[in-house]
């Protein structure tokens, strides 16, 4: 699994490599979950290239299945993508907006935004 563990004084997360696939197929999400749990890390940062080919096409149902699995195991995922420029299906941006409100997945443009989201979430748990 090509995920890097980032450890900061008050924050830990796993991050996928830029411009490299991590999830080749839908079932690979189980490997990410296993790796996250093995590292005792509930925060995950992924880039579009890390996701399955159909993730940004809602008709594939891949986004829903992946996010549901992560949610079931208590893993918070930040997806680093600019939805104003990255190609996606017609209603994907609406789904991303709703996911951002739920608190388990956050679509944002930078890793710094993801770190801030993780920090807010971790602070709310204390």
Positions of predicted regions on the chain:
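Amphipathic, Lys/Arg-enriched alpha-helical "gate/interface" segment within cytosolic domains
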Residues: 2-126
């Amino acid at each position: 699994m090509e995920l890097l563990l980032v450890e900061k004084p008050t924050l830990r997360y796993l991050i996928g490599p830029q411009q490299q696939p991590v999830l080749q197929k839908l079932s690979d999400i189980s490997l990410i979950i296993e790796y996250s749990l093995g590292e005792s890390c509930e925060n995950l940062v992924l880039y579009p290239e890390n996701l399955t080919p159909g993730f940004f096409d809602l008709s594939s149902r891949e986004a829903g299945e992946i996010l549901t699995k992560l949610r079931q195991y208590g893993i918070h995922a930040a997806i680093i993508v600019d939805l104003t420029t990255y190609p996606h299906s017609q209603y994907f941006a609406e789904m991303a907006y709703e996911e951002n409100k739920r608190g388990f997945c956050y679509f944002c443009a930078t890793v710094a935004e993801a770190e801030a989201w993780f920090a807010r979430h971790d602070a709310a748990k204390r």
